[in-house]
Amino acid sequence: MTATSIRFWILVSTAGVLMAAVLALHSNNASPSKPKEPWKTGYWIWAGEPPASTGFESQILYVEAPGNRWPHDLPVSEQYVVVKRIEPGPELTSETASSLVESYNALTEDAGSRVSIAGLQIDYDCPTNRLEDYGRFLKQVRTSLPPGSRLSITALLDWFSPKTKVRSALRWVDEFVPQFYDAGPSRTSAGIAEPIDVRKWAPIFNAYEVPYRVGISSFGRIARRRTDGSGHSVVRYFRDASPLDFVGRRELTRTTSATEAGELVVHYDVVAPIEGKAELLPGDTVDITLPTEASVRAASDAAHQFGGYSAGILFFRWPSRSETLTLLPDDVQRIVSGESPRTEAKLEVSEPRCIERQCSDLYLDLGPGIFDADRAVAIRATGPVELFLPDGPLHPLALRPSQISVRVPAYAGLGKVYLGRAISSGPVRFEVVPQ
């Protein structure tokens, strides 16, 4: 054998060893690629108050179901996914995995064959340094789920930092949902949505070859920020408050700003004690973050550019009936489809049963736009109203037997507001008078 041939075989052998090492490394670290999924736009819907009624039919709804009974007051959707929330703290055990699957099986059985349930999503904010443990837990869930049931997880953006064990989790799931909201290490009083940098995130997510849907914020929040003597800020969230609780108060001064993601933030500085509001003290700031057409459209446009294994958008969330901080799905759909969202208020009427009289409960849908000035809304009845019982935060007035007047203050929020009950001797239709 010549010196040249010896060198050739040494090079071949070395290349073979290197190739084997690369293949071994790939097999140990990479999750197997999953089939791509069709694009769908969906919503998370959270347990609690009944969901807002709307004629909009979603492609897919991710339903938080804390018990073992399937909620039967859900909006119509082509498909549903069961969501189980795991709070941070307790160790994830095999018993926890078994309990999740047992609850999922009970829910699918209770829902019946007429409800199309695609699978289970686990909503768990796993610490990044525990992703390997989370992967072992997901393996237990995956192997216990019935055949054909898909497994999805929510995902924190921090998981995708360099040198994490995120593959340990992704290898066992059919889908992950990176959440582009509340992405910081701690929640702040103002701002929710995270600007979506497609050039940064698309290559990262697509490299795992696992389908994903992008989680986008369509909700708002009210928070109080209080600074102590050392300059440290403490944030408290007001979960049952409405923007209408703060408008028109002399004890508050108002300013506004926009977040980097395009949300509107209405700031109220407390300048004097407020009667009946012991939780607010002079020096406090109340920050109201509201989603806007700009914030939702920018996020949706970005999500459509991901390509690869991107399989859609999930909006957090479908609002309840009494919310004034969250965009209605109808309005979200208009925004993401490129249409101009409506600017006018809309009236909704329900007819409860009353003895010997016609009763009509009136709700004013404020629309998706945030107005920076007060506006007047006139409601006209096609016949005489014998009695109008005003209720709710807007304090409407019956000016004439067939007309009701409502003043909607600036920055009143989103969603539907109850106006009161109209009582008449016979059927009466109500409509908003064009301005």
Identify the function of each model-found stretch.
Residues 1-16:
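N-terminal Sec-pathway targeting helices
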Residues 219, 227-341:
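Substrate-binding cleft of secreted/luminal carbohydrate-active enzymes
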Residues 69-71, 97-109, 135-142, 195-205, ...:
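Generic structural signal for well-ordered alpha-helices
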Residues 367-435:
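C-terminal beta-sandwich/jelly-roll accessory domains of carbohydrate-active enzymes
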Residues 35-47, 64-173:
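Chitinase-like catalytic core of GlcNAc-active glycosidases
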Residues 139-247:
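Substrate-binding surface in catalytic domains of secreted glycosidases
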Residues 358-368:
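Short, well-ordered beta-strand segments enriched in hydrophobic/aromatic residues
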Residues 20-36:
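Membrane-interface motif at the C-terminal end of an N-terminal transmembrane signal
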